[in-house]
Every structure is written in C-alpha cells, then in structure tokens.
Amino acid sequence: MILKYDVIVIGGGHAGCEAAAAAARMGAKTCLVTMDMNKLAQMSCNPAVGGIAKGQIVREIDALGGKMGLVTDATSIQFRMLNRGKGPAVWSPRAQCDRGKFIWEWRTQLDRTDNLDIWQDEACELIVENGEAVGVETVWGVTLRAKAVVITAGTFLNGLMHVGKRKVPGGRCAEPAVLHFTESITRHGITAARMKTGTPVRIDRRSVHFEDMEEQPGETDYHGFSYMTAPRHLEQLPCWTTYTNKEVHDTLRASIADSPLYNGQIKSTGPRYCPSIETKLMTFPDKNQHPLFLEPEGEDTNEMYLNGFSSSMPMEVQLEALKKIPAFRDIRVYRPGYAIEYDYFDPTQLKPSLESKLVSGLFFAGQVNGTTGYEEAGGQGQMAGVNAALYCGGSAPFVLKRDEAYIGVLIDDLTTKGVDEPYRMFTSRAEYRILLRQDNADARLTEKAYELGIASRERYDHWLKKKTEIERIVRYCDQTNVKPRDINDALERFGTTPMQFGTTIASLVARPQLSLEQLASAIPTLQEALLTNDARQAEIVEAAEILIKYKGYIERERLVAEKMHRLEDIHIKGHFNYAELHEISTEGRQKLTRINPETLGQASRIPGVSPSDINVLLVLMKR
C-alpha cells in the first residue's frame, strides 16, 4: 500500500507531536507515524513540564501556536514559579502534570487538527532519491511518500536498557526498540553516535510513610503556560521531600561494581545536569545526603515518581538502599529505575532550519539531535514541522535568532557547537535573557507566527488586545506625576525613601522596593488605570511593571543584540573554501569547514574560531 503526504513525522513523542501539529497548521498534508497511538507525548521520565529556562521554551511554543502549553494547563496538578526571588529575566514556570491525562489531551488536540493523519506502525527504512528524502517504508509493508520527512524518534533508535548486569533492548520500559532505522539514515553520510539517560523507580504511594517527609505544596499564584488559557483555580496535589543518608550511600557503594555506569557496561555519555544517584555518590563523596522529591503521577493513580534517585543499579540494590530511608522503610515499587542507551545524530550536520545538510527535505528534532527534556524536544519539533511545511512549498525557512527566543538559542547551540553530552537548556546559555522572559514570549513571537500561518487569528487578536492594555498602563505611568505630599507617607510604609520633589509613577515603579500593586493602594487614579476588562489582568499588570522597572536594562540589551545582527546579516555560506584561507588559524579552518556556517554571526560562535579569524572573514567579505 502506498500513502502520499506532504510531510511525514516519524515518532509520536513531544517533538513529533509538535512537529506534526505545526506542519498541519501550515496547511501541509501531514502523517504522524507512531508505534503506539495510546502513548502520544508520553512523559517517559518525570511527570512535569517547565522549569528553569524550560518553562520559557513552553511559553514560546505556545506563542508560536504550539500545543504543549495548552496540554499542560489542561492536566496540571501543581504549579510553581521558580526563581521568584531573583529578577524576572529568570522566572520560570513549572507544573506537575497528570501523566495519563497529558497523553489523552495531546491525542484530543491532534485528533482536532485538520490536515493531520496518525498511522500506527514502525518506520524501518528511509527512502532517499537523488539526494532528497521522499518517504519511509514501514514494518507492515506500507510505503509512505512525502516531500519532507521529520525524524523525532526519541530514545527508540537501537535503544538498550540497563538494570544491573541485565540488558534489554527497548526504547522505553516494556516497549520495543527500533533496531534498523538508524542504518538507513547513516548510509547517506549522516553521523550517528550513542548517548545515555536514565529514570528512577516508580513508587506505590500506599507504601510511603508521609509523616516522615516534608510536604511541598504548590503556589496559589497560578500562571497558565498558555497565553490562551483563561485563569482558573487549580486544585493542587503536594510533592514531598526527603533525603538519602549514610546507610543508603553505604548500600549503593558496596555494589558499585554492579553498576553499568562503573563496570564498563555503559560507555556512552549521560546528562551532566541530571546525574544518577550512583554518579552523585562517586562525584561528591563528601556529601552525607542528597535531596529526593516524591512527585505524584496523577490524580487517580497510586504511582509516584522519585526525583533525584535515577539509577541503573541492580533491582534488589535499589530497593535495599531505599528501605534505609525512614519514609520508604516499607516501600513497594511498580518498576525499577533503569538507564537507556540510544542513537543520536550529529546536529552540526543540520542547517539552522533543522534540515539535514546532506539529504534535502530530511529534518531532525528532539532527542535524536542530542538534547534532553520534553521542552527542548517540543521546541525543536515546532520549528522542524514549520520548516518541513515551508520546504514543501518552496519557501524560505523560518529561523529564530538568539535574541528572539530560547528556541533560537537552543537550535543555534546545536547546529553551531554540537554536543558531546545530552544538551539541556539553562537561562545561563542565553546572552539576552532579559529580552527572553517568560512573560513576553507572545510579544516576541505571536505576530511572526500569525504572519507565517501557524498562529490563529484568535490568538493574534488576543495578543493585540493584551499589547494595547500593556502600552496603556506604561504610558499612564510615564505621563502621570505624583507630589511628595500625596505619596510620602505610603513610601515610608513601604520601606523606601520619601520624595523631595514630584516625579512620575514610572520612576517610583523603578525602585526595587515598590510594585504597581503597592503604589495602586496609595494612588486611586493608578488603581483605576490598572483595571482592565481582560481576564488576564494580573498578567497584563505584571508585564507592564517589568517593562517599566527594567526599561534601562532592556534597552541596553536590545542595543547589544542589534550590533550582533550586523554579523548575522552577513551571509558567508558558499563564499569560501576555508581550507585555502591560510590567514585563518588551522583550528579555525577545520571548524569552519566542518560546520560550514550560514552567517558570520554563526561563525563567531563556533568553538575554536577566534575573533581574529572572524576579522579575516569580515575583511574578505568587504572585498
């Protein structure tokens, strides 16, 4: 049987679901190929979305018309805004989700998407003709033909799970690996390598002594991830915290020779920022305890996730160690922790559009590009799906710059620097994080998305209304003066210096001790100005306050970004044979040849390419 589409997406994880939905919204006839339609966007590890920098990515996906934010809001069971004690540049939303409901909400979203079919099958052969990806063959003998193919296979390509000395092929617990698809990709010159990740035990809550743990409730100030979600009261479930102890550590150390990570059984690299419990013990031998977080998997299940105890130690060792923790003395588990090795592909062989440099019309997104995390996968999937659809129509690709989105930072890092370990996004990776806040993803991206065709008119109108209200509040604060006699008593109550002369409300908001809400309690006209008929009034006021309070920082960072744009506007791909440019350092020639950057800006970010190398290229381009 032959089925014909514009875009085929291989893999129904977080990257694949966003890619398929995005391509279909662009008008491309799309097919999502997945081995299990009942596990779409499965949360293979922790049942949570967001976190530091990751929450910003989810809001960006939403601002671009993607689905992850909507699905998260519909299935949240706890919410927290991380980094509240720091500046808004690094505020990051995080939600615990109901794992089962998350899958079915994604299924509902995809079922309602026009131009999208789902095919339950396994891709086994990539079809390439004349250097172009034109489809795939499946294990059921179906030929799927298309103009573009997006690979989002997660950890399933030659996946191998480890628990102690036991090794089981699989892409996830009790799910088969895809064993031959990698070879059909690498025969076209695409480089594959291996990475490793892991996950902890899943615990039966009925066996936990919660009286020996500390409750960690959510925040009452609930922010939705989606700009389209109406504010609501969130019934929240608590998480719980406890710690390992010396007995736990002694038990694990006594069996370290049975750990696949330390006996040579696993040779691939795991995520630096999500280490296994055995790695923590070996890396930090002086620490007497490590924190553990017990997270609910859903409202209607007894299954709980033990964050902080990822392990591939033998099953009995994991259980013996956990029973040394008072809260887990009678522990029962649903399954052990395990490590998994899998194939990924060198992301420096991709264009900034996530299209392969070697096979036209072939796109990659998610963990197959060497990243880790649902959010990083979803962001890549969104961009790969959009660009696959644009490719089908012969249009120029859609690429986000580093000052436009964390997604832009992510993809630029992957395609420019490559990876030697699973890549995780942090706010520290973004040099323009004051511009890339979680509150303004819609301001940065929704208009672009609407013009491109991936954001609806409803979403665009929603943003325009919000923009008008924010600008009105900022303008009012800039133009309205207050006199010392009208405000000084309140300023003293708020713990800030009284005024000697009249000033604008905006200059008062700029004080670190003051907020719009505080000032509104003392200035009746400001209280009236903050009132809107928008359901998300609190979000609008917060956005206006950030723009006022951090105006100088925002303007300064924007100027720096605009200077960098000059290098981004100088396209150098195809202009040089770098091997012949002896004015450039040997390492610089080698790296430039391998990456073959699109712009001078991208070239400047390649490790090993020096500023003097960039100056040489700049002089040559001016000639």
Task: Locate the predicted segments by residue.
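A glycine-rich dinucleotide-binding beta-alpha-beta segment and adjacent secondary-structure elements
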Residues: 305-371, 398-412, 537-591, 596
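Short hydrophobic core segments
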Residues: 10, 143-154
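Core beta-strand elements of the Rossmann-like FAD/NAD(P) dinucleotide-binding domain
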Residues: 3-5, 139-148
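Conserved N-terminal/central alpha/beta ligand/cofactor-binding core
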Residues: 21-125, 129, 140, 152-172, ...
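Beta1/beta-strand and adjacent pyrophosphate-binding region of the FAD-binding site
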Residues: 2-15
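Extended, charge-enriched "interface" segments that sit outside catalytic cores
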Residues: 429, 446-615, 619-623
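Internal hydrophobic alpha-helix adjacent to the cofactor/substrate pocket in enzyme cavities
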Residues: 377-398
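An anion/pyrophosphate-binding glycine-rich loop and adjacent beta-alpha core
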Residues: 36-38, 54, 182-319, 411, ...
